[in-house]
Amino acid sequence: MKLDKSKELFDEAVNYLPGGVNSPVRAYKPYPFFAKSAKGSKIYDVDGNEYIDYCLGYGPLLFGHANEHIIEKSIEQLKLGTDYGVPSEKEVQLAKEVIKRVPCAQMVRFTNSGTEATMSAIRLARGITKRDKIIKFEGAYHGAHDAVLVKSGSGAAGLPDSPGIPTDTTKNTMLVEFNDEEALKKLINENKDEIACIIVEPVMGNIGCVPPKEGYLDFLREITLENGILLIIDEVITGFRISKGGAQEYYNVIPDLATFGKIVGGGFPIGAIAGKKEYMEQFTPSGKIYQAGTFSGNPMSINGGLAAFEVLDDNSYKQLHKSGEYFRNGIVDILDKLNINFHVNGVESMTQIYFTENEVYDYKTAQTSDTENFLKYFHLLLENGVFIAPSQYECGFISTSHSRDDLDKTLNAIEIALTKLYK
C-alpha cells in the first residue's frame, strides 16, 4: 500500500502539532494515513487509497460520511450564520426532539462536547447533593477533564492519570470494577452520605465494547436511590445509536441525568446534558450552578442534530441491528473456522473482537488482550482496505451506509489477517 503523501504530511505535522495529531487516539506507528475525503461507508486518503470505515469519527456518524440530507441542511444554515450569541428557535426544536426520545429527559442543556457535558453533569450532581465524592468505573472514559482522568487504584482515593492534574483534584474520585455488585456495595457503605453521583457508560466503549451483565444497570439504579446518590448515564457513545432512546430505553433504566454527544450533532461538535426538570433548573441562569459556553447551542451543530433526527427512523435501527448481528456472527464463524478462541463483544451496531481467550466483562479482563498482535491485525486490515480504530480498547461502529457487500469484504479481510497472524 502506497502512503508516501501521508508520510510526507506527517513528517511536516510533527513540527507544528504535538505528535503530529490533535488527539492522541489518532496516532499510531509508524504514522497515520491522512484523510482527503469521505463518503458513505468509505474514507479516502491523500494517496488515493480507499478504506471501509468502522471508526466513523469514533462514533458520531450513524449514517456514514457526508449524508446528503445533513449536507443540504448544513449548507442552508451556513448561509444564515454560524454563531448568534443569542437563543435560536432550532435550539428549542432539538431539545424537544431529545426529550421526545430519551426517557429521563425533561430538560436539556447543550454544550460543545461530551467532555463538557460530563464535567457539567458532575458539577450539577455535586451542587444538588452538596457532596463531593463521585464513583466511576475502572477503564471508563468520560472525557478529558481532570475529575475523571483517573486510573485504577485505591477505591478510597483516585490517582491522576496524567501529569498536570493535582492529586487534590482527583481525591474525591473513587473507582470500582464494572459489573461487580459486591465491590460497589462495599465502596458505598464505606462512604455513606458522601457520594454525589455514580457516572457510568452503560456499554463501556473505551475498553472495547463491554455490555452490562443482566440486571446490573437495574442494580445501579436501586442502590443509588437507596443512598440518595444521583445516577448519571453517560450516553455519549450509546445515545441514539443502540436504540431511539439510547441505552436507558434499551435496558429500561431511567437515570437522574444523562450526557450525550456525537450523534446528537449529526456529525458536528456537540454535547448535551438531559435530566429531570427539578435538577436541570439548578443550572444558571434559573439556578445557581454555573454552566456556560460561547459556542453552546451554536446553529451549525444544532442544525446538524435536527437534520439527523429527520432521517433517523425505525428502519434505521432495524438495518443497524441486522448489520451488527450479521457482522458479529461472521467474525465468530471465522474464529471457529480458524480454531482461535477469541471473544467477540457487541451491542447492536457496536462491536469489538478481543485478542484473548478470557471472557471480557470489565477493565481487568479487557487488559488480558494481546495488544501487540491487535496492532498487527489493525495494519493487516488497513492493507486490505479496512479501517478500524488502532487500539484494542476502542469500539468499532457500523453505519446505515455499510452495505452487505461492505460487511462481506470486511469479513474476508478479517479472515486473511487472522490467518496470517495465527496460521
UniProtKB/Swiss-Prot annotation:
List its EC numbers: 5.4.3.8
Q: Does the keyword Isomerase apply?
A: yes
Q: Which GO terms describe its biological process?
A: protoporphyrinogen IX biosynthetic process
* One Pfam family recorded for the sequence: Aminotran_3
According to UniProt, the name of this protein is: Glutamate-1-semialdehyde 2,1-aminomutase
Is Nucleus a UniProt keyword of this protein? no
Q: Which Gene3D superfamilies match?
A: Aspartate Aminotransferase, domain 1, Type I PLP-dependent aspartate aminotransferase-like (Major domain)
Q: What class of enzyme is it?
A: isomerase
The gene behind this protein is hemL
Q: Name one GO cellular component term.
A: cytoplasm
Q: Which residues in this protein are found as N6-(pyridoxal phosphate)lysine?
A: 262
The entry's family comment says: Belongs to the class-III pyridoxal-phosphate-dependent aminotransferase family. HemL subfamily.
Q: Which organism is it from?
A: Methanosphaera stadtmanae (strain ATCC 43021 / DSM 3091 / JCM 11832 / MCB-3)
HAMAP family the UniProt entry points to: HemL_aminotrans_3
Taxonomy of origin reads: Archaea, Methanobacteriati, Methanobacteriota, Methanomada group, Methanobacteria
Q: Which InterPro entries match?
A: 4pyrrol_synth_GluAld_NH2Trfase, Aminotrans_3, Aminotrans_3_PPA_site, PyrdxlP-dep_Trfase, PyrdxlP-dep_Trfase_major, PyrdxlP-dep_Trfase_small
Keywords, comma-separated and alphabetical: Cytoplasm, Isomerase, Porphyrin biosynthesis, Pyridoxal phosphate
